[in-house]
Amino acid sequence: MAATFQYPFQCIKSVERRNSGRQLIIGSAGPKIYTYAAETGERLGIWPETANTAEAKAAPSTTGEEPPEKRRKVSPPPDQKPEDSEPASQKSRKPEASPAWSTIPILAVSADGEYVVAVTAEDKCIRVFEVEENGALKQLSERQMPKRPSAIALADDDRTILCGDKFGDVYSLPLIDTGKGSVAPRAPAKVRPDQPAATTLTVHSKRNLASLEQQLRHYGQKDKNSAEEKPSSTFEHHLLLGHVSMLTDLICVSIPMDSSSEKKRSYILTADRDEHIRVSRGPSQAHIIENYCLGHTSFVNSLCIPQWAPEYLVSGGGDNYLLVWRWNEGRIVQKVPLVDETSDSEVAVRGIWVTDKMVLVAIDGSAKLLCFTLESDGTMKAQNSIQASGNVLDLTISSKDSAVLVSVDAVHVAGSTQEWRATPSSSSTLIEAFRLKSDTENVEWEPMSEAITSQVNSQGTSEISATLEEKQKKELNDALYSSGNLRKKNLGEDE
């Protein structure tokens, strides 16, 4: 049997359902989304649901390796035998229909824990799911955006999706699809004759006949293009703002309008590939630009505002440092180095997260999770880092015990975004848990043996063949580690 890896979790989220008090862990690995009980690690659901998933619901101990149940046939060939007449061993070897996407690079969760928003990459769809009582995901809508989404966030009302795309635009969409279109009516076209007034009876010279023939071909092609014109989007969405380059991250935040007022004003902070961070007002006034935070020299792809100190912003991207801002003033508070100043190695920040007055930073292709404390004056101090067993892909903070759950890449060699491990391990490590040591004065982390980690790691996700062709390996490399592609190439004078 060929050796196989397991798809690592590209995104992982901790979900606390306010209505029921139940805590879940949701992660996307390859083309699927998995949900788990946070306390026990029991797998509660897989989306999209397969025959194996349905069987697993009937028998919780099933790991998905047994023959699938009978499935509805879709357009079988005329000479294909009925499915019931085939041996079970042949049924189990039948490949399942592949979805139209290979990865789910973005997940977001509503504050009440009732809804999950996901982006499926290749089909450019934003999908909204309801988290059911049993922990499974029920898809409520799928909306194909004009351009591929590159960042999403939920607005302060928790019922509006903000979507940034690769062309720099930011749209707002209702969380629950209204079914109403929002495309502005087109201006009436100028009345023009459908065909030239001249005919072969009125044109006689060879040159004029050739010109007439060309005009007729032009009008015929125009009619064809009009007939083939794609229909407009039928779901409600509104353009809020735009950048002149690819939008890489966005967040929404509300702060008091002044020190003596309880009234708050919402803002949208957006980052792009051209080193810019833009501060705009909330969705209703997004056309108003408050200021820019300018100071990066490479792309910016990660923005983070601490909940306990919303006046500060931590940003990172292709520079070998982070910047701490007083974002409503556009003022840099501190420049925080990520590597030794003498190092010429390129750095790509993968993500920035906050927990317990601390800031955690992941670097693309690194198994080390950098840790900083955020002081009251907005400065950050480096602390002991977290060492994972593989490259850090994502993390989430458990609301139950503030444990840091880290998604680990068990496919690539630690420290590399291109080199695959020689052989898969007998049991893949998909997530690891860490917590702060309570009996030390300094900030120190220790690994935790949690039910959630052991259960998730033992159940695995989908399999990846260790003998994939180089082209397929490169596709997975690019899907997991895309930050480096944002870096602009320095072309020499002779190029």
Curated annotation (Swiss-Prot):
WD repeats lie at residues 99-139, 245-290, 295-337. SUPFAM superfamilies: WD40 repeat-like. Forms a heterodimer with the catalytic subunit trm8. Residues 51-100 are annotated as: Disordered. Pathway: tRNA modification; N(7)-methylguanine-tRNA biosynthesis. The gene is trm82. This is tRNA (guanine-N(7)-)-methyltransferase non-catalytic subunit trm82. It comes from Aspergillus clavatus (strain ATCC 1007 / CBS 513.65 / DSM 816 / NCTC 3887 / NRRL 1 / QM 1276 / 107). Keywords: Nucleus, Repeat, tRNA processing, WD repeat. Belongs to the WD repeat TRM82 family. Required for the formation of N(7)-methylguanine at position 46 (m7G46) in tRNA. In the complex, it is required to stabilize and induce conformational changes of the catalytic subunit.
